């Protein structure tokens, strides 16, 4: 079978310029998803092209991804990233992945032992918010999570990411091996502390001495990641196959823009990521806050309200002047004033985001971005609203964004079509939707403490703002409600 590993590829395809036989699995990565392929794996590949070295990646997937992993092995762990710009496309074959393991194809025992190999210096993760098994209300490990319950009963055969990390670190300690750095690359606020809380929470339940050793020896740097990477579709894979002249089932498309800000605290070394344009810093939080509120907040705004209005893609929203103006106004008038970052031209940043959202080549579906809203609302919108409530400033578009999520999860768009709602809290949400009518819906959903906390449902201004926005959507539909908010 001909694959990208054996085919003669067109000259415009960038290929690894380093000796892949020198790679070792110095990075073990949880979650061989689209974003990781187009972001951390690509940037590590750039480092290898620039300065060489042995910083290979071992990809890990636990309970899914066995087909993808089999396909990756068949093409010598190579895969393609197609950077799609308004002015043309650039195909890049990534060679940084050295090996892969899957619980179904291999075994859980083999995966845990991989973490214990002496050369492993970094364990990185893109497992989404759900994978950390954190209780959103406390920010701590959720001891009632089914996988955490299992892992505490079966510590040497764990099934969760926190359980596997703790068992691997316990074995390394017992064998006299050095610790590794745990690097969350998920798009969640304060991701370093999230994974640290998960790991230490699990370790403390197993052994206070182990928890102390991890706290003293393991680092959990924060990161800010940014690149728009739509999920692969049959159409995007066919487009890449046409560019390459051969199928690549592991390929992914993305925008040309890429950014990675990393707290430079590694206990066992790291690749020279700065040679690939990565910003190594002492403090990631201001960058993360800027991105989550200005980029991700406006992305979710466009996803929920754009979908309700019938826009299938973010670029379709950008073709609609009402949504285009609203996204920029949301960024600059309501999100930017809540930030703590200094030395950044936020107007220029907003303009760059509008350009990126407008990229017609990406076909980033509003339905995809609208998923998992219960996990996204707090950091993308609610934290900014809390700042406005404290200051007494206005937040009409943020209110519309929150109410837009409420209408979206209610399950019907403005044309009366059913919505396929995907969310980890979908059962709780649908129960509250079913038990409330239009007039009660806002209060019913505000009762979800995992999302809104204890403060916001008791804040008179907040509740009034969301009720008013809900009424605008109910009366006028999403597009007209957004247009009215622009002129309010």
Which functions belong to the PLM regions below?
Residues 1-488:
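Substrate/ligand-engaging "lid" and interaction regions
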């Amino acid at each position: 079978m001909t694959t990208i590993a054996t085919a003669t590829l067109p000259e415009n395809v960038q290929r690894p310029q380093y000796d892949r036989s020198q790679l070792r699995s110095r990075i073990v990565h949880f979650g061989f998803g689209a974003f990781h392929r187009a972001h951390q794996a690509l940037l590590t590949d750039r480092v290898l092209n620039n300065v060489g070295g042995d910083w290979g990646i071992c990809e890990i997937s636990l309970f899914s991804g066995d087909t993808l992993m089999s396909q990756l092995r068949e093409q010598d762990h190579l895969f393609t990233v197609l950077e799609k710009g308004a002015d043309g496309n650039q195909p890049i074959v990534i060679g940084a992945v050295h090996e892969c393991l899957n619980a179904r194809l291999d075994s859980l025992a083999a995966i845990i032992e991989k973490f214990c190999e002496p050369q492993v210096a970094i364990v990185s993760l893109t497992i989404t918010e759900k994978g950390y098994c954190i209780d959103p209300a406390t920010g701590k490990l959720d001891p009632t999570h089914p996988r955490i319950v299992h892992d505490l009963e079966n510590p040497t055969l764990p099934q969760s990411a926190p359980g596997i990390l703790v068992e691997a670190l316990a074995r390394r300690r017992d064998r006299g091996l050095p610790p590794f750095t745990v690097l969350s690359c998920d798009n969640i606020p304060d991701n370093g502390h999230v994974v640290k809380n998960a790991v230490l929470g699990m370790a403390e339940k197993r052994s206070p001495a182990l928890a102390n050793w991890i706290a003293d020896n393991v680092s959990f740097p924060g990161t800010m990641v940014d690149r728009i990477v739509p999920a692969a579709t049959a159409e995007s894979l066919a487009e890449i196959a046409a560019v390459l002249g051969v199928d690549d089932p592991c390929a992914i498309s993305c925008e040309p823009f890429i950014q990675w800000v990393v707290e430079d605290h590694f206990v066992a070394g790291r690749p020279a990521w700065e040679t690939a344009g990565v910003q190594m810093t002492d403090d990631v939080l201001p960058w993360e806050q800027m991105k989550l509120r200005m980029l991700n907040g406006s992305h979710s705004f466009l996803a929920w309200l754009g979908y309700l209005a019938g826009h299938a893609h973010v670029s379709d929203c950008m073709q609609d002047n009402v949504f285009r103006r609203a996204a920029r106004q949301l960024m600059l008038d309501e999100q930017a004033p809540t930030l703590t970052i200094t030395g950044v031209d936020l107007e220029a940043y907003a303009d760059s985001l509008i350009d990126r959202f407008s990229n017609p080549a990406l076909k980033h579906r509003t339905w995809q971005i609208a998923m998992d809203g219960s996990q996204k609302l707090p950091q993308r919108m609610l934290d900014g609203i809390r700042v406005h409530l404290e200051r007494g400033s206005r937040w009409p578009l943020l209110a519309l964004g929150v109410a837009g999520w409420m209408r979206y999860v209610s399950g019907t768009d403005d044309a009366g079509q059913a919505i396929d709602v995907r969310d980890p809290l979908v059962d709780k949400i649908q129960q509250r939707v079913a038990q409330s009518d239009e007039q009660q819906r806002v209060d019913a959903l505000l009762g979800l403490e995992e999302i809104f906390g204890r403060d916001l449902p008791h804040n008179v201004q907040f509740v009034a703002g969301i009720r008013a926005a809900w009424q605008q959507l109910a009366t006028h539909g999403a597009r007209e409600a957004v247009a009215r908010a622009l002129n309010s």
